[in-house]
Amino acid sequence: MDSVSASGAQRQDEGLRERIRSSQAVDVNAVDQALATAGYGVTTDSRKNDNKKTFGRTPDGTVFTVPQTHDMVSQLLSPTEPKTVSDFVVLAILATHILIFVALAPEARISVFAAIYMFWRTSYNGGIGWLLHNQSHHNTMVRWATKSKIFVNPSTGENPHPTLYRLLKRDMETMIPEDYSFDDAPLEYNTWLVFRRIVDVILMCDFASYCLFALACGSRPENETALMTTLRWAAGWVLVLFNLWVKLDAHRVVKDFAWYWGDFFFLIDQELTFDGVFEMAPHPMYSVGYAGYYGISLMAASYKVLFISIIAHAAQFAFLVLVENPHIDRVYNPPPPRKRSIQHDSKDLHALNNSQTSPISDSFPATPDDKAAMRQPAPSSVHNLLGLHNLDLHRVTDSSVILIQLLVFALTVLTPSTPFYQYLFVANAAIWRCWYSIGIGYILHRQSKYKSWTRHFVKYGENTDEAWRQWKGSYHLSMTMCYASFIAATWKMYTMPSDWNHGLALLKHTLGFSLVALQIWTSVSIYDSLGEFGWFFGDFFFDAQSKLTYSGIYRFLNNPERVLGLAGLWGAALITSKGAIIFLALLSHVLTLAFIQLVERPHMQKLYGRSLRQDAGLVKSLKRSLPPPLQQLGGSVDRMMDESFEFVEELLDSARPKLATGVNTFMKDAKSLFRQYPARITISRLDDEVAAGYDLEDYSLEIEGTESSPSAQVERSSGKEGVHARAPPERRGDLKSLIFEYGAPIRVKWTAPLNHSKRDWVGLYMVTDNTRREVTRVSSQGRWIATNEGAYDSLTCEKGLISSDIVISASRRRDGENRDLASGEMVFSGDKLFWTTGVFEFRYHHNGKHNVMAISRPFEIRIGRFDEDDVLNMDNNTTSSNSDAIIQAAIEEALLPVVRNCFDRDPEIAPETYDEHFGSLVDRDGKYAKRVVFAVHQMFGIELAPEVVRADGNVRNMAWRICNAKKVLAPYSMSRSRGTSTPTTQEKELS
């Protein structure tokens, strides 16, 4: 696409501080009505001013006016802003840092302030990260505020902290003089205000302690000239000022709401415009927003400051990946609506079941949906190549790549680093780079113009999918060899510094490895944006989309591989400081630019024409900041580059016939030459309350679940046992063994004394995991539910809770006791279940600890095996022509309830019919497909990859695939009725 709209669903790669516009526009009349209901006055005369206000929306739907607030620095340091008690506390802490710095001896300042800074940095990335993670998943901070009642007016008599209430009210209303009332504001907003004051303390102390640490480490290197000192300080100040501009411009765009992670608490209904720094780089607050750290390191001329800056920067990226990005995906990028089932008439379904497939090279013929997919422009991506998680040694491409890499590694390590071998490795790297750029470029150029690669495979009866697979393998092998040979050459040319403190050795290694990391990040970002199809130039082989999509790193750069994608090569050149590696890096850069200009660009222009954008976000921002004469100069340079490449193209076109003639002559001579010359002790500590008087007879657990299929019951006595064990077991009571369906929800009913602890909880365990009945010694791993709502600072532990503390009178007790009981119900489903087979039990625990008060009956989760012989024997109309259709229909019937269980019976993703498509969340979260894979393996003995489940997309396609897989594997089966097996005695006699 030409440009990407700024909707939250489409900017998933942005940082949290780049909050996107709301999902819907504000209905002013509805807002006025909601505000009036909440007690806010809205008059007709103020209609014009209302359009400038920001409205917030809490998770429960409450709409409120979000008042204007000021940034942290202005609030603390501006004399025009009113000061609060918390402001003076922050200023006092900052002053304490300065006093400590002055009081310490110079030699002690470095270690002390390194420790202080790391404390505040850990508080930032670890402490704030932990708070935000729990707020995002469990609404923890708001629940704390609710339980502590610190925002409840003391006049009601419910607030146990009236002094804290008055202090917070005075501070907040002083800090926000307009459009704000502490008593009327929503709980979420007040909680956010308190949270941002904590953030103010941490951020200010983090930056202040860093600056003091840099000041303690600052020095001037020996023998440094005045010119070098001037340049060093000038470059440092440029980076610091650039950092300051990034922060100010980012705050101008996102305001305090996103600056302080406001959408972890509430959302705003407002259109946000993102420009400036957000067009320059991804996550500018965390990427280019840390340039000042390196500027300060440069001015301090200290490796200590540089390395602690790198550690802080890495911690910030970890904070982004682990805390912010998951929240962004959950809030702003929900799964799209699922595809509903498409109704077919009976004739279509009959034709679908009885369709015959033509022989193809794959072991599994294409399913009905696969046949439709073959008419689509792009192939389905099931068995990807890139990434260690996609490594498959059964695939010839992967095994070849691994073997060749081992060979390169062995040659690199075992050969000496003499000039001869150095020259050999450098020449090898140059040859592979030439092949990777020129050879691959020639193939793609021919494919773009004449479809020559595809035509070759069609000539031998193959299809486009086979051509695509072979191309991916060739390109993947070429790419890995290109970089492996470069790494080998770098290793041969590298010499370990004898003195790391001499010269710029340490700095060059640091910058070099940083450039390598930058190239790795760029490659990962490119792959995330393009996918497997784009990475392997899929639009050279299949019809492309009518509109380009600029997402991810391509929002900022048109061709990121042109500069950032080669940063690691220059990093290696910087580390080795050898002319040969510099030559390889320069050669690689020139060839890559030529590949983009001569191969990629013409093809993209042919496909997309005017829809190709001219300038990316970064270029637009830079052009806007340049004066008009320099902008014209940039256009002139672009024209000169285009004319130069056109001249080179014309030169190559004119020389091609002569080169072709020479190559043919060389090949003939070479062939003639080859023809001529062939040749422990456990002590359990019980809670005092348990020993003090709780009667264990008052506690009980009863469970209900969906019984497993009859085949699962039969498999317990299948003829493999001794003679006496084949008969059903004799039972002396009316209770039978509990065998439940795989993945089906399990309802748990509990009873406890009326005065039981509100922090009691029930957990699910495997029977073999706990050897003691009175104490649980294994963690529940999230498979637990609290008996009462609000007892824990987590929403997850309340998921599945149905009822609590329903009184059961003594007259209804079965054991004859005369005490009333409390009871409740809960349902374990989804992530609270074990997704495997085995024997399990529920345990009731006391007061948030692991003392066991009651244990349920053990129950088994078993998946019955599918027996096609039974299916055929039950159908009297079975013939050889319709047996496959009957078996496939039976597989569909057996598979549908299992798939629904694997998808948590969620109406958004679980299918209702055989043809209904799976929800899009199945593609995002791999756990659902892995559950189905396990169930299919247990039921049918067929092992599928999770990617196949996602690609099939519905139960009918999966049933078809399983049916055909069983047919393919039938010759290797020991079944009597299916496939070619060893002849039986009767068959021998008949023969």
UniProtKB/Swiss-Prot annotation:
Segments in the Cytoplasmic topological domain: 106-111, 219-225, 301-302, 422-423, 496-510, 600-991
Q: What spans does the record annotate as topological domain Lumenal, numbered to this chain? A: 1-84, 133-197, 247-279, 324-400, 445-472, 532-578
Q: In which pathway does it act?
A: Phospholipid metabolism; phosphatidylcholine biosynthesis
Catalytic activity of the protein: a 1,2-diacyl-sn-glycero-3-phosphoethanolamine + S-adenosyl-L-methionine = a 1,2-diacyl-sn-glycero-3-phospho-N-methylethanolamine + S-adenosyl-L-homocysteine + H(+)
- Name the Gene3D superfamilies on file: 2.60.40.2840
Which PROSITE patterns does this UniProt record tie to the protein?
SAM_CHO2
Keywords annotated in UniProt: Endoplasmic reticulum, Lipid biosynthesis, Lipid metabolism, Membrane, Methyltransferase, Phospholipid biosynthesis, Phospholipid metabolism, S-adenosyl-L-methionine, Transferase, Transmembrane, Transmembrane helix
Instruction: Spell out the subcellular localization from the entry.
Output: Endoplasmic reticulum membrane
User: Where is there biased composition of kind Basic and acidic residues?
Assistant: 11-21, 717-730
Listed under GO biological process in this entry are: methylation; phosphatidylcholine biosynthetic process
Span list, region Disordered: 1-21, 352-376, 705-730
Membrane topology for this entry?
Multi-pass membrane protein
Give the GO cellular component terms, alphabetically.
Answer: cortical endoplasmic reticulum; endoplasmic reticulum membrane; perinuclear endoplasmic reticulum
Sum up the protein's function in the record's words.
Catalyzes the first step of the methylation pathway of phosphatidylcholine biosynthesis, the SAM-dependent methylation of phosphatidylethanolamine (PE) to phosphatidylmonomethylethanolamine (PMME).
UniProt lists the family membership as follows: Belongs to the class VI-like SAM-binding methyltransferase superfamily. CHO2 family.
**Protein name per its UniProtKB record:** Phosphatidylethanolamine N-methyltransferase
Species whose genome carries this gene: Talaromyces stipitatus (strain ATCC 10500 / CBS 375.48 / QM 6759 / NRRL 1006)
